[in-house]
């Protein structure tokens, strides 16, 4: 029995200690005052290991993220930052492990930098309140230095100016730190500018600041030597972050102690015995001054709690959504996967299940095919997924689907959309060229050349199919003013060139066909307010009418229009009676699909006087984000912000009466009108809402499902995606002589050792 029990204990211990030899992406090292122990952050927890290396022991094990450990001078306590209550707060705990005590309770990020000389308080950085005498710009990035008692209590401000990585001298009369002059990423390398960090010293008694470093690049992370006169810090003087030594008496003189290349040294700390500890290339090192750095061979005794696949709820967070032409379901994208849901949210079908991203999803006219872009195998291409079984009418309850590549070339192709007749697909090639792909011939042709656009971010180009599939409205950048977009018109067959419809010199954006192709509406800043620098800060919705008849009809007063409508209804009734008597279909009968296709008459544009046939539809300027017309063209619905967040507003175009239609209070909004015109499909802050087009009453579409998420595969994709974005879009074709491919391999090896978004974002 004793033998069996001993075996069970041994097996249990071996299971716990199954882990990783030589793990990577070890961050935020802190060497103990006696130089015997090194703390570090790994996978969101604080670990402890001998300064000689060996098996590391976790001091925290939680679902929250803990980092930035610092030691008390007596070596009995440690402080660290944790987000276990939402934002990052300062905690303190025994150095050997135990219960952590929360010391700060503010709503902003707060991170410890050191203990005071007498170990009675902890210094930390946070953004709370500047002194009235502080002349720096009051941005949230400009933190202050505070202290909090180790036993808890009132927080005191030490410095109103940013003082990062602040540590105190042994007597407590000096604080050494690096500054923060303006926004720049903490992890940017090799840059020189007016906002790079410098090392400073603050005399507590005289309250005097003295700048110690003057290198035009980065100097940061200073720590005192035991004599309180010399100090060590990290600098890019040789082009890569390395450890340097200088002194308060002669700060202009510095000596480089390490000579690492390509990758930066980070997180410098020092023990009382002079041992330095730091991180380089994802691993930990210690060094005695005068000796070479020694890598710590570390083994992580992990319990394998990181699951590769996780069940993730899908109940919001849609990055895009589109209503199906049948009006019965909608497609949406969540975490790069495509789903289709019924309009009540009760039936949801996951369409794609890949580690890469799918986006720009839209339906075919018959609602049986989805077209979208996918970044498969490190290249954006166009794909379709169709319902295979004829007896199945809806995606949300379909059982067999078929995916096929449509446009798959070495070029980047995305942002596809079916033509209304279903015969073609428009898409962007290499972000700036608008092309049309003919599904019958399987050939593509250009309708808007790349010289007419400049894409700054994916998704910033816009086009819209005409109802007759013969034209496309486009938002383009004229050569003279590339970043002041205009609205243009191009033929879907690529002939005739580009026509500038707006010619305003202001921002004209997001044109939409309305009134069965008789007009378009778009947003323009021509009547909007201007900022002091001259840029537009608000816009209006305008309409342009492609025929004189449509323009004249729009100008009728409410009373005049009522008379015209009365006569039209009378004429229609007489036509119905004649048709009925002759045995034919009435004017009100629902046409068959084929008849409906034939009834889509070609759009004939009256070019004579076209630019004069426009009207401002909104009664006052605002920050409108989207706009649609009712099916009869009598109401303008638009999303804009007059209060907190975007709301849905409506304007009666005959009377110009404008009112709040539905209170959304959302930050990110988009919408489209249902095919029958009875409701508005709104996406507000990642959730879908139905708004009745007559009453304005809203009904949330409560999607509540879940998906299996492979976090590791998703993370690997995002890494490749970000790397490719930089390579494809950097303005310098030669990437400024940087060997970008080598950096891909240098950093990709860290991916297996990252299990959270904080570490991933830093990497």
Mark where each language-model region is:
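A short helix->beta-strand "capping" segment at the edge of beta-propeller domains
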Residues: 20-26, 54-56, 302-318, 399-405, ...
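A flexible loop/linker signature enriched in serine peptidases of the S9 family
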Residues: 20-23, 41-47, 55, 60-66, ...
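Beta-strand-rich domains and repeat architectures in extracellular enzymes and scaffolds
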Residues: 21-47, 317-336, 618-634
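Conserved beta-strand position repeated across blades of beta-propeller domains
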Residues: 30, 70, 114, 167, ...
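Short coil/turn segments that connect the beta-strands within blades of beta-propeller domains
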Residues: 34-36, 74-76, 118-120, 171-173, ...
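Conserved blade-ending motifs and adjacent loop-strand segments that build the rim/top face
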Residues: 255-269, 499-511, 625, 662-671
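Intrinsically disordered, Ser/Thr/Pro/Gly-rich linkers and terminal tails that flank
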Residues: 615-616, 640, 644-763
